Amino acid sequence: LSLGMPNLAFIETATRLLESTGYRVTYIPQQDVTVEFYRRLPARGDDLILLRVHSSGRLVTKSGTVVDDSSISLCTGEPLSKAYPKERNSGQLGGFETLGTEQLFFSVRGEFFARSASGKFPQSVIVIMGCEGLRIPRTAEIFLDLGAQAVIGWNDQSSTHVMDAPAAPFLEAWLRQPQTWKEAVATARRSVES
């Protein structure tokens, strides 16, 4: 979401919360979130992954019709090009246009992780902070098959404020209180509903 919708305050708050509970935080700026970054994501060994990236469970057909996709696409910061012909031709990669930009960027679909990613998630908790992160469960299922403990996200499109608002209460509840990730999700939900 840094692409067109940055939120430095969220990054600072999340970093402070995580570091205060012993986590070592690695922030990856959007321009470094590439196809290769996603390919190596399971093998990085991260306990907690906050994917604050554009995402969608829909695609546009050649005729211009918007239809449900078979999985969620996660946007990269890598401009669309002729690179990765094998992955493009097999439908593992697509193009993604974000609001406020006229440039297309690569997006990775669920099957990319199933067929082209390296390594396994070490019981990671993955939070997909973009739109529709759980609208179609296939990508989350693939993450679980690759060793993730849990995948948390939204079912629909939303504004960045609504997507960012529950993240800090979730981290606070999960890391400091401490609650299970399921309890922390409920706490975060209550915090934004009140």
Q: What function would you assign to each model-found segment?
A:
Residues 3-10, 41, 101-111, 118, ...:
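Extracytoplasmic/periplasmic, Sec-exported soluble proteins
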Residues 1-5, 16, 44, 117-122, ...:
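Proteins with a high burden of low-complexity, intrinsically disordered sequence enriched in S/T/G/P/A and R
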Residues 58-151:
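Cysteine protease catalytic core and zymogen-processing segment of caspase-like enzymes
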Residues 25, 33-35, 53, 60, ...:
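Extended aliphatic helical segments
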Residues 124-194:
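Active-site-proximal C-terminal subdomain of hydrolase catalytic domains
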Residues 1-95:
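A domain-level signal for caspase-like cysteine endopeptidase catalytic cores
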